[in-house]
Amino acid sequence: MRLNTLSPAEGAKHAPKRVGRGIGSGLGKTAGRGHKGQNSRSGGGVRRGFEGGQMPLYRRLPKFGFTSRKAMITAEVRLSELALVEGDVIDLNTLKAANVVGIQMEFVKVILSGEVNRAVTLRGLRVTKGARAAIEAAGGKIEE
């Protein structure tokens, strides 16, 4: 068996109905669109969320909240991901070099998820309480 020889089981796929191809097909003339009306026309139909002229739900409800711009440039890094970084001193630039965080990130917070198996020094990164305890238990330290 090879990927280029795979095919669906016999009878599993049905050919699509060819509409508008004569009255004998059962889907000729109006092709299942009915008579007249907006939906029978070429390009007919209404946009998503349109409620027939009634004020739509997305406009009846008030706006709320916002997207924090700082959250967009802040990354969370798991303890287990620190193993992907070479060297003992880990800072923002070494995380970017190891492709652990994206190049557009300006802040990093290390969270307790997984385990750290070597002594590392974190420099200039924010760390949660649980992650701090795990790093210090492994013999590492955190420098602000």
UniProtKB/Swiss-Prot annotation:
Transmembrane segments: none annotated. The keyword Repeat does not apply. Keywords: Ribonucleoprotein, Ribosomal protein, RNA-binding, rRNA-binding. InterPro entries: Ribosomal_uL15 (IPR030878), Ribosomal_uL15/eL18 (IPR021131), Ribosomal_uL15/eL18_sf (IPR036227), Ribosomal_uL15_bac-type (IPR005749), Ribosomal_uL15_CS (IPR001196). SUPFAM superfamilies: Ribosomal proteins L15p and L18e. GO terms for cellular component: cytosolic large ribosomal subunit. Residues 21-31 have a biased composition (Gly residues). GO terms for molecular function: rRNA binding; structural constituent of ribosome. Belongs to the universal ribosomal protein uL15 family. NCBIfam families: rplO_bact (TIGR01071). Binds to the 23S rRNA. This is Large ribosomal subunit protein uL15.
